[in-house]
Amino acid sequence: LPKELLEQDCVISLSKMKTHALERITGAVKNSYGFVYGFHKAKGHTQYPSADSFARMLIDLNKCVAPKLYVMDGIVAMEGNGPGSGDPVPMNVLLMSTDPVALDSVFSRLVYLKPEMVPTNYHGEKMGLGTWKEEEITLLTPDGEISMAEAVKKYGNPAFNVDRTEVRKNIWTRMAGALNIFQKKPYIEADKCVRCGICVQSCPVPGKAVDFRKGKGKPPVYDYRKCIRCFCCQEMCPKKAIKVK
């Protein structure tokens, strides 16, 4: 972390309401990864490649930096292929809290995503950073206190494009994980790719999981045996040519 950050009297975290290929959403908790600078960001993805391990690292990071206030801009949010290549969608909300887990859980509910399905919410509550439980959250608006149901009815968007897939922790999913099958994978839409190489540069894996294996006259190619599913390539692509399936 930059020493200047740790020398400040107060830190305020300003996040954008967006989807995320690895963590489902990126909001208050995930925003703190922006405090990590330079190539340390890429190193973090190789050290914590899974959604759960990455989420736990983010919880520790938030405890270390300890922002006094978390503000989330949801006036225009991003849905779909986030966090860098999604589509803008108006949510018309500005949220703030001293509890980043509660803030992200409200975001989750507004887009009809179960908050406990978001790794940063689940581990954030387990590790004592905050709470996603509705009965422990108070919602205040300029017009006074409202219930979660009232907030969802007034500000929610059930059509918001976010991954709501249920993950079943049984023997078949564990076997699939071990065999590297049935996992989300990034892929390149050749007609959109301009072969700029930013995806190759952003890949944190030693030896590169995506590279110009057929020469720079054609789009980069993935080696899924190396890919750790950090989706840095998808996040950094300036042409929205990388999707996750």
What is each model feature region?
Residues Y122-G130, K216-V221, K226:
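Small/polar glycine-rich anion-binding or flexible loop at a beta-alpha turn
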Residues L1-E189:
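Extended, low-polarity segments enriched in aliphatic/aromatic residues
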Residues D191-K192, R225-K226, M236:
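Short pre-active-site segment immediately N-terminal to redox-active cysteine/selenocysteine motifs
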Residues R174-G215:
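C-terminal accessory/binding modules appended to enzymatic or scaffolding proteins
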Residues I198-K216, V221, C232-K245:
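Iron-sulfur cluster-binding cysteine motifs and their immediate structural context
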